[in-house]
């Protein structure tokens, strides 16, 4: 069958795959044969506007085939978001065993999908990662393991600050994504040390505990009251904890303001 702009989310809904969200418009050729109870199926697809958890990853070029011997769907794909932004995906999904194992080789992969997980305190993610991750586990208890190193910037909503990082290392283990003593920078390239983790239950019910040790670091920068009773710019030395879950963020500050700070 020739496919033209088929909604990927619709297809995943048909096979009851809701572990993580993929979207896009798939075109290409799919062949399904069943001779004397000997099923065979394969497809060569191009998926435009391919996204993972609302994060754009470019155009996905995917070869998919039914592995009769192992009774699983083998997937070999590349998400092409430009010459320096490639994501290689190789692995399988087994509906019979209710299991997934997808290896993800990130080569300048966009980290925009983090907004879907950390949107209660973070947005405007402009970051890219390199490393290797596995999406693996029972389809109802999916997990993420591996390591990735990222560069770019994020915006912390409650603080109204942009922070950049040159080589932030994240280590994913079951139900946790860990960061240990990594350097982040404010707009003046002042340094703070970030540690902590993003916790999840099979990539759902996310929560987070992040700790920042700062020296003369931009910790708050607003130009109007908004929801606060104050506004201003604060450079601080000390410690900041960011804790929370979806829809709820608590920021604990134990820091001294530095010269140049202004609060109205």
Task: Explain the meaning of each model-derived region.
Residues 1-132, 140-239, 243-264:
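Interface amphipathic segments
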């Amino acid at each position: 069958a020739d496919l033209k702009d088929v909604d990927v989310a619709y297809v995943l809904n048909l096979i009851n795959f809701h572990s993580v969200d993929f979207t896009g418009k798939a075109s290409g050729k799919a062949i399904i044969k069943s001779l004397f109870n000997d099923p065979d199926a394969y497809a060569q697809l191009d998926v435009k506007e391919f996204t993972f958890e609302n994060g754009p990853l470019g155009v996905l070029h995917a070869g998919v085939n039914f592995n009769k011997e192992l009774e699983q769907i083998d997937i070999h794909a590349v998400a092409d978001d430009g010459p320096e932004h490639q994501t290689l995906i190789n692995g399988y999904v087994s509906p019979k065993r209710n299991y997934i194992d997808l290896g993800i080789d990130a080569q300048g992969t966009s980290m925009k999908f983090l907004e879907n997980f950390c949107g209660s305190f973070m947005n405007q993610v402009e970051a890219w990662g390199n490393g290797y991750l596995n999406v693996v586990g029972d389809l109802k208890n999916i997990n993420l393991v591996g390591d990735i190193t990222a560069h770019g910037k994020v915006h912390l909503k409650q603080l109204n600050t942009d922070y950049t990082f040159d080589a932030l290392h994240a280590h994913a283990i079951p139900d946790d994504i860990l960061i240990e003593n990594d350097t982040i920078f404010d707009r003046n390239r002042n340094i703070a040390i970030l540690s902590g983790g993003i916790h999840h239950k099979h990539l759902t019910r996310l929560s987070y505990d992040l700790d920042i040790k700062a020296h003369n670091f931009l910790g708050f920068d607003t130009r109007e009251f908004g929801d606060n009773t104050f506004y201003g710019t604060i450079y601080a030395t000390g410690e900041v904890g960011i804790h929370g879950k979806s829809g709820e963020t608590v920021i604990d500050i134990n820091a001294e303001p530095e010269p140049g700070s202004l609060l109205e």
